[in-house]
Regions:
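Structural motif
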Residues: 2, 55-56, 120, 172-174, ...
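Short, hydrophobic beta-strand segments that form beta-sheet elements in well-ordered domains
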Residues: 85-90, 175, 179
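Metallo-beta-lactamase
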Residues: 80, 88-171
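Active-site-proximal loop/helix segments of hydrolase catalytic cores
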Residues: 70, 145-202
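Short hydrophobic/aromatic-enriched beta-strand-loop microsegments
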Residues: 4, 85, 103-112, 197-201
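Pre-active-site segment of Zn-dependent metallo-hydrolases
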Residues: 2-58, 62, 69-77, 131-150, ...
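Structured loop/turn residues at beta-strand edges in well-structured enzyme cores
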Residues: 49-52, 118-120, 160, 193
Length: 202
């Protein structure tokens, strides 16, 4: 059993906060300063503390709507789930570590890595999430007071922030594009793998 990008938090619950945190990805991507007015409108129907059967918790990237402290706490506090591994790029495993997940339960992946779980093969692939690309920290921004102008993050840096996944299963192959933006690189993945179902959030 694999759990992918499960977010059980409520997101923005107030409109009292007017300005984005300095360096917020939406500010860096579009230049806006005011926080979006959207609030999470629907309740989360899945209680993470009711999860009793799972083998891997996967995160595609470290934005808070794809990696959840509540899910990590639920897994870590359930004695039935002491075997569960947390899989994601470097920024995700660092976040899980900060939340108390021990090192021996973390699996850090980068594009090109392959892990196996029983009869499922999981391929970590390049992500095209340009929003994640401009999320701090970005190498060199600390010397520019958090500004990104003139900086070009490397492929290696992007691989530490976000990945897409391909799940090879006996029943077919599932591609998870996470928050990747529209890109001609999807064609590369489509030619590289025989994909039966493709999922994309963006």
């Amino acid at each position: 059993n694999i759990c992918m990008d499960l977010w059980c938090s409520r997101g923005k619950s107030t409109k009292k906060v007017k300005d984005m945190v300095r360096g917020h990805q939406m500010e860096n991507m579009s230049g806006v300063r005011k926080l979006q007015p959207n609030l999470r409108a629907q309740p989360m129907v899945l209680d993470p503390f009711s999860i009793n059967e799972v083998d891997y918790i996967l995160a595609s990237h470290y934005h808070s709507d794809h990696i959840d402290i509540n899910v990590a706490a639920a897994i870590m506090n359930n004695p039935k789930l002491e075997h569960v591994k947390f899989v994601g790029p470097w920024h995700c495993t660092e976040l899980w570590k900060k939340w108390g997940v021990p090192e021996d339960r973390l699996v850090t992946v980068k594009p090109g890595d392959v892990i196996s779980l029983k009869d499922v093969e999981i391929h970590a692939l390049d992500s095209f999430d340009r929003t994640c690309l401009v999320t701090l920290p970005v190498e060199g921004s600390e010397n520019k007071n958090g500004e990104l102008s003139g900086l070009c993050p490397s492929d290696e840096e992007m691989g530490r922030k976000a990945v897409n996944y391909l799940f090879k299963t006996p029943g077919g192959n599932i591609y998870h594009g996470a928050d990747s933006h529209y890109s001609i690189q999807f064609a590369k993945h489509g030619k590289q793998f025989d994909i039966d179902v493709a999922l994309n959030n963006y």
